Structures are given as structure tokens and as C-alpha cells.
């Protein structure tokens, strides 16, 4: 509760059902490259479409969520991606209905409130999503929800083992 999480459902939800199960739901709307930063922009949605990954926030944490009056869409299993581009970078938010280990140099897993670079062998849980970027290897991946920046996770790169100054407060 209170955190953004990723979900990809195998059935549609109407706006009334969305309001019943989730406090807020956001979809990937655009991507932009700004220097060494890659900005992902998410905005409001009313209905949820089967096979599309969304950021969701629940009002309260539950261990099991039961959906009523829904129909599984078998065709959604093979689709399930949102693709946006600004010309310099293309972002593909891929949904999955089973555990997967995505392959590629520019794959990002979602943790509550942030995307972070997926290490080789990272497993993505069922009914979630992961991000693939083409055209750029950003230093930072910034997540914007309704125009406001959320958590920032530095992307591991060539400077990962560089010497840095560390300061303490004592």
C-alpha cells in the first residue's frame, strides 16, 4: 500500500472495476532522452486492457486479490507490450503472465517505485512487466507520474567501480 507496483492482467477491467481494486492506475505514455537521462512518463487511465502492464497503487495491502465478473483474453497472452519512442530512444514495457528471465543488454526490472537495471538471470514474476530500451544506455532512468518525478535509480555502467569522495556527518 502507498507504493507504485507493476501489474499485467489477463483480462480487461472497466473503470468501475479499476476503482474497486486500485487507488490509482497509470500507463506508459511517452519516453524522452534528456542528456544522459532517460525519462519515462506515465499518466492516468480509466480502463485496464488485458495484456498491458500498468503501474498501480492499492489503498491497502492484501495477500490475495479476487477479481469478479472478468473474462480471460487468450489473445492477450501474445501481445502485452506498450511501445513509445522519441526518435532517439524506444521504450518497450513488456507484460508477462508467467515467470520470465528477459535477455538483453538494456533490460530493467521494476521494484516498488523504481526501474533498475536487471542483472543477468533476473527473474520477473508472473503478472508483472519489465522494460527494454533501444537506442541508448542511460546513466539514469527517471520515472515521472503525472509530471512529477518519483524514485531515481542510478544505472550501473562504466563508472560503477570509480573512486568517489564519501562524507559522514560525525
Can you describe what each PLM-predicted range is?
Residues 34-42:
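Short linear interaction motifs
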Residues 23-32, 149-170:
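C-terminal outer-membrane/trafficking sorting elements
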Residues 36, 72-74, 85, 145, ...:
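Intrinsic disorder/low-complexity signal
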Residues 1-21, 41-151:
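A short, polar beta-strand/turn micro-motif
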